[in-house]
């Protein structure tokens, strides 16, 4: 078995999701906050996007081996649902279109996942945020392409030809809040053209892999 295929509910506890060493598994994990998306008109609702590290993966998703962008995904081949916060759950066989997806081992009712068609899925979270997942190109993985907040404000997530996240835009104005630049498969810098209402100037940092 490849380390990328290791799955256990033990990794869904908060001690593993937060930065540090999980005393139960002995595994180290780390999260680096990249951006926090907030709507203009709703308080106390936000979506934090992190770079997350797991020693159990040998994949390089553009940020170095073991690092991934913390976005919700659904692998329709392995039936693995991965939440933005790091939790993973196995789905039962996908239902017909326009039906809710069921999970083998998930008991909490803090979200519901619906299959619109073979390429599009909706994740309804308890905090009111709706995530739209789509399969991009020939990929088996449906990725987050939109985040809709309770007041209807939407952030669109745009991917490049290599299926890597390249921009996050605010749908109403078209403003870019996050831009990721790549050299080949590797992300080389991250830009904040608008900085999510906090600063009018651009900011950026470079990644050394």
Region annotations inferred by a language model:
Residues 1-209:
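Surface-exposed recognition patches
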């Amino acid at each position: 078995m490849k380390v990328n295929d290791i799955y256990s509910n033990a990794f869904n506890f908060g001690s593993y999701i937060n930065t540090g060493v999980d005393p139960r598994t002995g595994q180290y994990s780390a999260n680096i906050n990249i951006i926090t998306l907030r709507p203009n008109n709703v308080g106390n609702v936000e979506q934090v996007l992190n770079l997350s590290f797991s020693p159990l993966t040998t994949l390089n998703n553009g940020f170095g081996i073991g690092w991934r962008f913390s976005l919700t995904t659904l692998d329709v081949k392995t039936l693995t649902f991965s939440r933005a916060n790091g939790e993973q759950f196995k789905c039962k066989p996908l239902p017909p279109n326009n039906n809710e997806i069921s999970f083998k081992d998930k008991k909490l009712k803090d979200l519901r996942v619906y299959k619109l068609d073979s390429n599009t899925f909706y994740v309804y979270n308890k905090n009111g945020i709706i995530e739209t997942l789509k399969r991009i190109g020939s990929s088996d993985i449906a990725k987050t392409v939109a985040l809709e907040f309770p007041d209807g404000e939407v952030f669109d997530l745009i991917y490049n030809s290599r299926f890597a996240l390249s921009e996050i835009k605010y749908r109403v104005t078209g403003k870019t809040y996050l831009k990721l630049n790549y050299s080949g498969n590797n992300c080389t810098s991250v830009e904040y053209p608008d900085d999510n209402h906090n600063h009018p100037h651009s900011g950026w940092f470079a990644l050394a892999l």
